[in-house]
Amino acid sequence: MTSTASDILSVYFLQMQAQNKNLLRVVPLFETLDDLKNANGVMTNLFKLSWYRKMINSKQEVMIGYSDSSKDAGKLSASWHQYKLQEELRSLAKKYKIDLIFFHGRGGSPGRGGGPIQATLKSQPSGTVNGKIRITDQGEVIQQKYGYKPLAEYNLCSYIGSVTVSYTHLTLPTMYTV
């Protein structure tokens, strides 16, 4: 989890010390309620650094965790802070001309970010999907969603369709909604 800018910078520093010529991207994870509240400040401290923006090629992925914040604050409060953070980071990225992609660490239950992908993406703040999103499905739901080929195809189509609808702001006829 990420609490300070140094949590991110130290990983890059270790890669440089190891003389890794192709730096692996480092994705900050904001999951606890305190981390969600402090994330805008953390990312501001990083984005203010011109060499950091250059190092990441003006592309930043940020992971939003669901489980710990729901445990800390309850589902409603956690959801509000996750929503608010995405709005703040969208504005911050725009200010610094950073291409921002949100990475959602979803569990199976609604308290862990689970639920229908269509509803999840419709509920994201405007301008935070932009045709790009990363989502993990936790171990307990992988078999349920992808263990049988027709289900895997259905779920993949649901993800692709939901991102497309969210990005283009299209409204699908009811017969096509899942």
How would you name each of these model-derived features?
Residues A18-Y167:
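Catalytic or ion-translocation cores adjacent to nucleophile or general acid/base/metal-coordination motifs
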